[in-house]
């Protein structure tokens, strides 16, 4: 729903920019339209959970007594929320993670605590909305460039530090 949205496989200047990184990227970038997983009904959700289970196992996370473990360490994380309104969204998400053997929990904190923890990257996962202008520009460097990955207060909350993204 934007003239700036990518459609289909990479072509033209986009393909030229990404070509040096082809070995590091999924083939779909150059061959097909990417589609995110869908969960319109229980069958699609079940298929996604089966795929997630397979990916976890391929990455070395085995199910032991109902808990995903790798090298003896349980797969667990906390989700930081700034509003109780997100709890109704997180509850089914955490429930589905539990089906996979992932020990996840969520916690709503005061906005000032949320902001402080966000600015110092003191979280495992959080809910955050990245506002964009109609014509994205320099703000993308602060959100996704390696130079901002460890800079306190940046909006690179994911810690993205990758030459492919920087290109």
What are these regions, as identified by a protein language model?
Residues 49-55, 59, 80-93:
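Bilobed "Venus flytrap"/periplasmic-binding protein-like clamshell domains
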Residues 1, 5-8, 12, 16-40, ...:
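Extracytoplasmic/peripheral linker and loop segments enriched in polar/acidic and small residues
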Residues 73-83, 104-107, 124:
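Short, well-ordered beta-strand elements
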Residues 62-74:
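Short helix/loop segment immediately N-terminal to the Walker
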Residues 135-140:
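Short, charged, surface-exposed secondary-structure boundary motifs
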Residues 128-133:
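Beta->alpha turn/N-cap motifs
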